[in-house]
């Protein structure tokens, strides 16, 4: 077809219905559909799903306008009922026992015939229809396009979680559920409409399906329309993804029709390989490798998508879609799948409700794209330095003792600054905000920086920011503070105690933020000799930490080294400590869920004896790690939760273990997940139990760079003197500052905040407080770091 008469395309979208109070699936589709036009909005197998049918269009702009209009009407009608709408292959919060199959005769028969398949069909897909009225051509083209379906599936992957919230490890778990049905998968290689019709008749006659509409092949001639229908894709929260898939599928159909009519063979791929490639796409999405079925071999998803788009350039140019598809496909591969965004949302605070909220917002078109957040790759190790042969001079590091730098000496100015520091800190302390919710805190910092004449850069999402101060130089030194508080109810009774129930600055981040604000004031008045970046980071208290988001947003671009301070209640005010090498430990989370046959304790041989298997895992995994890992790495597994059973005379059917795994060695940390996975498999092999391992990688150790540690020591000595600089011990706690040091050299020091008289209050505890006199030492140390210059000796 020519561009003047391109094939028309239409879309069917399926949407989950979400209770906006609980964020769970709700079976209120009949109530919602009663408020909507029945020619566009229709029911589905489950009462928690609504299908929306677009019109047909020759241009993508018309299709987009249609989809936007129908989504908006659906979202608005649903919100009036307290219902949210989510376009995704699956959603993570549901109670399957509360779900109901739609009460029509057809769906009732499907429930009777397929039982658990129908009951567990809590999934949604996107179907794309392309004009192809010749049924003989349609059945042949369906077979010719089959090898390319994995790419379209990967682009749409949006179902990483099961309905119970468990991470499946797949990008499209919907595909796994869908392929359980007897008439799914790649289309049969038939050569005519008559042959295809005979196949469908045989399936109906066999009783496996009850009508032709239940032939759920990945691509099929539509039962009711003169179209070829794509059925392999997950529902897509973002309309850009729907348009990309629709444009690519239309171009692919056009190319294969042209090839069929010209007598050219299509790509010949065995069905087994096609099925394997579909599995890989469901497993990996856009984040790992896909299978190039033409070779065959594994290739990065971005390469395969790019080659696929380029192969369709003639058809895309004919329809006027080339530029748009190039842009959308580049964005998709750069920023990853919906499945990856959902895992990112969960990783920030560990809340599945955040995943649901993300899907609701994207479906409604209420969010802008956030930079993809991936764990930064390790920095290539450079030659180690011992600091020998180096001399260093200060750029007036202790300029507060000099009267010739300004009319007001540092001693005079700090009397004012200390009062401001206390004022700022107490304001932040009274208004704590949890990770990725630090909007007020960000606003306070932003207003302060703008008032100093600086130009802060706000991070996507509105929490966190950074700005530069000083001259434009080749070198840029970064200073980092964290903004977030903890879900800990404060019990200090202070006049400025937290006003937010259940939330407090129990880790001293209010002081960290205050000290960097103070440093900004000093550096603005007394400009440093080199450019300094002040990084106010959100969400340190999450896994893998807001540092990952901050790096992805560009805060380290152009930075040559980075420093940070952390409050330490084990050091008195006036003292600081640091060390070369690891100063914190890695911090991973291990969750094991177990299932087995339950029963009476009088007959344990008829059960899986899950309690015994759990005990073996509790003791055995620690023993395996003790024997397989060098003891000098201080790798420790600690179980914090072991739950199974209710009463003494009943063997339980399920149990759960949750623990943390920490290591002082970065190399050991990198090897822990496969070691734990293998050990659990072998420990539980003799027992008749099923299990699911959820291994959440946290942060690696903070490993202080030798040269940067030398900088930090000299800055500290210039502030508090040699006698007040201590050698830090390595903490078993974790700190996401480690991610910065995976990218650039840097170092962290601990700042003493104990007043030396009362009982030490530990970090993360309800009674934690700090001696505010410590903050001025922190400000001076941060400023001193900006006034060092290396000199070759």
Swiss-Prot record:
Q: Which Pfam families match?
A: GCS2, Peptidase_M20
What is the name listed in the Swiss-Prot or TrEMBL entry for this protein? Putative glutamate--cysteine ligase 2-3
Task: Cite the InterPro entries for this sequence.
Answer: Amidohydrolase, Bact_exopeptidase_dim_dom, GCS2, Gln_synth/guanido_kin_cat_dom, Peptidase_M20, YbdK
The protein's matches in Gene3D superfamilies, at most eight in alphabetical order, are given as:
3.30.590.20, 3.30.70.360, Zn peptidases
Function noted in UniProt: ATP-dependent carboxylate-amine ligase which exhibits weak glutamate--cysteine ligase activity.
- Record lineage: Bacteria, Bacillati, Actinomycetota, Actinomycetes, Mycobacteriales
Do you know which SUPFAM superfamilies this protein is assigned to? Bacterial exopeptidase dimerisation domain, Glutamine synthetase/guanido kinase, Zn-dependent exopeptidases
Cross-referenced NCBIfam families, in alphabetical order? amidohydrolases, gshA_cyan_rel, PRK13517.1-1
> Per the similarity annotation, which family is this?
In the C-terminal section; belongs to the glutamate--cysteine ligase type 2 family. YbdK subfamily.
Q: Which CDD domains match?
A: M20_Acy1-like
């Amino acid at each position: 077809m020519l561009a003047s008469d391109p094939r028309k395309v239409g879309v069917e979208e399926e949407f989950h219905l979400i209770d906006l109070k609980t964020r769970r699936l709700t079976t209120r589709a009949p109530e919602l559909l009663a408020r909507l036009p029945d020619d566009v909005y229709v029911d589905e197998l489950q009462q928690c799903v609504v299908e929306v049918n677009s019109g047909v269009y020759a241009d993508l702009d018309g299709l987009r306008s249609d989809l936007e209009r129908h989504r908006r009407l659906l979202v608005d009608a649903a919100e009036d009922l307290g219902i949210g709408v989510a376009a995704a292959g699956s959603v993570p919060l549901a109670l399957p026992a509360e779900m109901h199959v739609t009460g029509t005769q057809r769906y009732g028969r499907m429930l009777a015939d397929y039982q658990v398949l129908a009951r567990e069909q809590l999934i949604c897909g996107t179907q794309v229809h392309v004009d192809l009225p010749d049924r003989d051509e349609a059945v042949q083209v369906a077979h010719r396009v089959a090898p390319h379906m994995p790419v379209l599936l990967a682009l749409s992957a949006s179902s990483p979680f099961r309905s119970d919230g468990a991470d499946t490890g797949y990008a499209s778990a919907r595909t796994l559920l869908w392929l359980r049905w007897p008439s799914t998968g790649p289309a049969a290689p038939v050569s005519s409409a008559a042959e295809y019709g005979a196949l469908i008749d045989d399936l109906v006659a066999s009783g496996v399906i009850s009508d032709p509409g239940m032939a759920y092949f990945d691509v099929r001639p539509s039962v009711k329309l003169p179209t070829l229908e794509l059925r392999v894709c997950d529902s897509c929260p973002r309309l850009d993804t729907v348009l990309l898939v629709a444009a690519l599928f239309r171009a692919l159909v056009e190319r294969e029709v042209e090839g069929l009519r010209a007598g050219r063979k299509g790509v010949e791929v065995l069905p087994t390989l096609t099925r394997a490639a579909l599995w890989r796409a469901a497993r990996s999405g856009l984040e790992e490798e896909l299978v190039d079925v033409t070779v065959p071999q594994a290739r990065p998803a971005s390469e395969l998508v790019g080659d696929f788009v380029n192969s369709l350039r003639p058809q895309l140019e004919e329809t006027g879609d080339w530029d748009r598809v190039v842009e959308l496909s580049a964005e998709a591969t750069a920023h990853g799948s919906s499945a990856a965004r959902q895992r990112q949302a969960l990783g920030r605070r560990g809340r599945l409700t955040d995943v649901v909220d993300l899907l609701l917002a994207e479906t409604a078109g209420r969010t802008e794209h956030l930079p993809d957040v991936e764990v930064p790759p390790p920095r290539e190790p450079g030659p180690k330095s011992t600091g020998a042969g180096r001399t260093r001079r200060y750029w007036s590091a202790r300029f507060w003792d000099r009267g010739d730098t300004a009319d007001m000496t540092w001693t005079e100015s700090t009397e004012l600054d200390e009062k401001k520091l206390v004022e700022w800190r107490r304001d932040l302390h009274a208004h704590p905000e949890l990770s990725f919710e630090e909007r007020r805190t960000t606003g306070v910092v932003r207003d302060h920086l703008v008032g100093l004449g600086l130009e802060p850069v706000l991070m996507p999402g509105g929490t966190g920011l950074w700005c530069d101060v000083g001259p434009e130089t080749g070198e840029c030194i970064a200073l980092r503070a964290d903004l977030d508080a903890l879900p800990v109810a404060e019990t200090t009774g202070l006049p400025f105690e937290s006003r937010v129930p259940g939330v407090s600055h129990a880790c001293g981040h209010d002081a960290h933020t205050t000290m960097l604000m103070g440093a900004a004031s000093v550096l603005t008045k007394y400009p440093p000799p080199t450019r300094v970046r002040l990084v106010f980071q959100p969400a340190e208290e999450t896994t893998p930490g807001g540092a990952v988001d901050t790096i992805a947003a560009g805060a380290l671009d152009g930075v040559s080294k980075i420093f940070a301070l952390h409050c330490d209640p084990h050091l008195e005010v006036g003292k600081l400590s640091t060390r070369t090498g690891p100063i914190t430990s890695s911090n991973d989370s291990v969750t094991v869920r177990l299932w087995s046959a339950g029963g009476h304790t009088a007959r344990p041989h008829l059960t899986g004896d899950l309690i015994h298997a759990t005990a073996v895992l509790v003791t055995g995994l620690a023993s395996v790690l003790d024997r397989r890992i060098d003891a000098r790495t201080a790798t420790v597994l600690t179980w914090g939760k072991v739950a199974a059973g209710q009463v003494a005379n009943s063997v339980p059917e399920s149990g759960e273990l949750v623990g943390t795994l920490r290591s002082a060695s970065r190399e050991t940390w990198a090897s822990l997940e496969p070691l734990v996975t293998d050990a659990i498999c072998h420990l539980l092999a003799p027992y008749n139990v099923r299990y699911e391992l959820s291994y959440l990688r946290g942060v690696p150790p903070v490993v202080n760079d030798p040269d940067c540690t030398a900088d930090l020591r000299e800055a500290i000595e210039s502030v508090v003197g040699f006698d007040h600089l201590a050698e830090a011990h390595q903490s078993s706690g974790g700190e996401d500052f480690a991610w910065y040091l995976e990218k650039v050299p840097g170092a962290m020091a601990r700042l003493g905040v104990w007043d030396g008289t009362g009982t030490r209050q530990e970090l993360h505890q309800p009674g934690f407080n700090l001696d505010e006199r410590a903050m001025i030492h922190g400000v001076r140390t941060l400023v001193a770091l900006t006034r060092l210059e290396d000199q070759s000796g």
